[in-house]
């Protein structure tokens, strides 16, 4: 048992911890590809313990139904909470999150999550933990009033920035590179003595892009990208002021399936 798990036993009952371990054992035995993220991966990389009410398992959308069957056989009640990004497996009052995308539909779990994952042990079960690059990609878009994951991003960079593939992280953020830049500026503020954890070329490249947007000026299109990072804090701009909603335009495989189903005639005829 890791130091973090030892601390967890002080605040969580045995039944809850057993449920998490049983879920990991069942999924591991099934051969379904998955990685552990959330508080366990965060502790693995940073050494920072955070008491957690659940276990976050990340997997591809196409494997969720199979995971539901496996966990159902292990005594869990499974349901899809949101077709865009998350399912849940319950055992009594305890649950496991099965996550296949970020809530905004951008950080979709793909093969790279497993290819670059790291070996670890969680609840006595050998597992893979999500790569820090993909964790930062997913967490970077969580900037709600009641939950802001930017501090997690900073602590991850401080801990493992020198080990990360910054080329892949830049590629992950793609057209949303300004979100990454905002977190890197905050990181530099938080840890001025460890700025070198972020390669100089990364900052130079992002600041170059930023300078280009200053010269570019305003977009002609009246769009709000704020709901990509906060679902609620920009509702006024979209619903009252009439801005186009960038969140609604994200291409996500799960969202496309939902849209196709919605177009079917009554009775499900094609």
Region spans (language model):
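Helical scaffold of the NTase/Pol beta-like nucleotidyltransferase catalytic core
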Residues: 1-36
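Catalytic cores of NTP-dependent nucleotidyl/adenyl transfer enzymes across multiple folds
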Residues: 3, 108-269
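Anion (oxyanion) recognition and catalysis
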Residues: 28, 72, 121
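Short helix-loop-helix/strand-helix junction enriched in hydrophobic and basic residues
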Residues: 28, 33-40, 44-46, 129-131
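Short aromatic/hydrophobic-glycine micro-motifs
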Residues: 32, 76-77, 162, 211
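Catalytic metal-binding acidic patch
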Residues: 38, 43-71, 153
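Short, hinge-like loop/turn segments at secondary-structure boundaries
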Residues: 52-54, 76, 97-98, 115, ...
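Conserved catalytic core of two-metal-ion nucleotidyltransferases
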Residues: 72-112
